[in-house]
Amino acid sequence: MSLSRRSLFKAGAIALAAGAVGSQAPAALAVGPALGTIIDFSAGVPSAGAIKAAGHLGAIRYVSQRRPDAQWMKGKPVTLAETKANAAAGLKTASIYQFGRAETADWLNGAAGAGVHAPQAIAIHKAAGGPTGRPIYIAIDDNPTRAQYEKQIRPYLKAFSAALTAAGYQTGVYGNYNVIDWCVADGIGEFFWMHDWGSGGKIHPRTTIHQKAKTQATIDGITCDINT
């Protein structure tokens, strides 16, 4: 049976609310028409009511702490109170892990880095009421070279994914076209959230969620990225 983009989108935005139940989300197969939007943010947390009033299906939230040099990221990490409020409003919440950025990127230490970051992702996801059997996205917020992928990113993702699998979760990857393409070839990940940096205007056919560059909105005073 073929899967529509709508079904894939819903699968990538499974509720984190405590006690959430449902069948295991299907693996993403192909891009189709986008029939909804989901937001991500870090500077603060818009209310569930404001998100719903803006017409979005939910939010992708950080299961990672703020960096010491980024205390402005008041929206990190996601909390149980937030996911409960989202669920009560009929909104979905998905999880993504990203602590470092650029010269402090989580993937720079390869598999050893996953040993540090994967347990944190799992712990914060659980603390926010996140069920097993759901994807946690791993961020590759860069435009890496093939050499960086082979030497650092692939080992990082494989080790992180292994930890997620062992804990009962699925693997999502946040990256550009090339990262997704390389991951698909290597069998890493079931869900793919694509950003446009270095993607050359292309959308990978295995994309589950697409974060289009410079597509933002202010909701409840918080700047949010809009994803389809």
Where are the predicted features?
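C-terminal region of N-terminal signal peptides and the immediate post-cleavage residues
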Residues: 19-33
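Functionally critical loop-and-helix segments that line ligand-binding/catalytic clefts
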Residues: 32-51, 180-228
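Active-site cleft segment of glycoside hydrolase catalytic domains centered on the general acid/base Glu
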Residues: 143-164
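Aromatic-lined carbohydrate-recognition surfaces of secreted/lumenal glycan-active proteins
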Residues: 167-181
